[in-house]
Amino acid sequence: MPGITRWPAVLKNEASPIPLRPALILSRAPQNRFYHDRSELHDLHIVRNHGVKFGNVISGRLSDSNYCRYASTNSKPTSPESPDPIAEKKTTKKQPQQQWRVQKDALKKKFAEGWAPPKRLSPDAIEGVRELHRQNPQKFSTPVLAEHFKVSPEAIRRILKSKWRPSEKEMEKRKIRWEKRKDRIWDHMSELGLRPRRETPDSPLETKTIDKLPGNQGKPF
């Protein structure tokens, strides 16, 4: 077939350790068509700065203008000294988890929805728990403190483990929050009829009238 040159079965070059498979290098001459055999022609890779350099066959000469080579896309250069990542992954042993990681996974499994205790201790009660445990850890252990304060042992454990201490500004904010919480609980219990209604500035009980007192009907107290 005119215009077609068949290269040897195995073609090597010192610049590239990859052997080139049999392929058909075609001419770009106008009179030639790109006839090729799919069983022999492989993917075309342009090599500009490295690798084997082959030019197009033009009038029986090699042109240096364009460089190309035919090689399989699956043939990748692998160094014989490079380790196999799959073999290393199989040989590496699984290291044991640290104690804090084991405990964290156990708590996450136990409290799937997060830590949300039904009962919360006030800041004064928390300081009392720490002080009692500091004075006599054997007598005031975690189960004893949990039974005394009517909370779970996990809550006592978290209180004793925590090293965070609030500043003076934070203590003032916490005091205000707990005052509001106390009023909210009192209002809820008063709605249930367990406690009398709390007297607030907006409550009608605060603006008492002394209708019951003689001589001062209709006047505020």
Swiss-Prot record:
Query: What residue spans carry the region label Disordered?
Result: 71-100, 191-221
GO cellular component term, pick one: nucleus
Q: Which family does it belong to?
A: Belongs to the RRG9 family.
UniProt name for this protein: Required for respiratory growth protein 9, mitochondrial
Q: Which residues cross the membrane?
A: none
Instruction: Kindly indicate whether the keyword Nucleotide-binding belongs to this entry.
Output: no
Keyword terms: Mitochondrion, Transit peptide
Show the taxonomic lineage.
Eukaryota, Fungi, Dikarya, Ascomycota, Pezizomycotina
Taxonomy, superkingdom: Eukaryota
Q: Which InterPro entries match?
A: NGRN/Rrg9
Give the species this sequence originates from. Answer: Uncinocarpus reesii (strain UAMH 1704)
Basic and acidic residues composition bias: which ranges?
191-201
- Describe its function: Required for respiratory activity and maintenance and expression of the mitochondrial genome.
Q: Could you tell me where this protein is found in the cell? A: Mitochondrion
Polar residues: compositionally biased ranges? 71-81
